[in-house]
Amino acid sequence: MDKKIFKEELEKYKKDIREFANVIHTSVNQFYDKDKPYIYHLDKVCGVLEDYGYEVCETLEDVKVLVFGAYFHDSIEDARITYNDVLKIAGKLGFSNLESIHAAEIVYALTNEKGRTRGDRENDKYFNEMRLVKYAPFMKCCDRLANFRYAVETKSSMEKKYRQEMPEFLKRIGITEPQDLMNELSSL
C-alpha cells in the first residue's frame, strides 16, 4: 500500500481507538515501566506500525484493524477484559462484524499463555496460534521493537534479554516481511 495513503488512513482511526485503549488501561492503574501511563507504550507500538505497516497492509479496511491491534494488543492480558469485550469495543468504534472479529483475533493471538516464566508464557502454542492470524506476527514484531527501543533508550536490563532472545524470536515468529522491519529486528 502507498505509504502516504496508509498514514492518512491510520490518522483517521487513531484518535478514537487510542482514547478507548487509554481508558481501558488507565481503569486498571496500569503503567509502563512503573512511572509512565500505559498509553506511552501503546503509542510507541503504533509508531512502529506507522513506520512499517504500509508494507504489509493489503486493504484500506485493514488499516483500522492494525491500529486497533497496536492499541489493544495487551488489553486481554493486562486490562482485565475478555475476547468478547474486545469484540464489543471494536463494534462501538464502528468496525463491521468481520473487522471486529479480525481485530479481536489479533489481540487474542498476542495474549500470552499462562505460565510462571517468560518462556512458559511465550511457548510453542503461543507462536503457532499467532502465525494463524493475519497480521498478528507483524503486530508482535511492532510490540517487540517498541519494547526493545525503550530498553535501549532507558538502558534497561531488558535490552540484553531482548538481544539474547531475538534470533529465536525471529525464527518462531515465522515472517520475513516487511523486510525493513525484519532487518531492524535482526540487527539487534
PLM region spans:
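Active-site helical microenvironments for divalent-metal-assisted chemistry
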Residues: 1-188
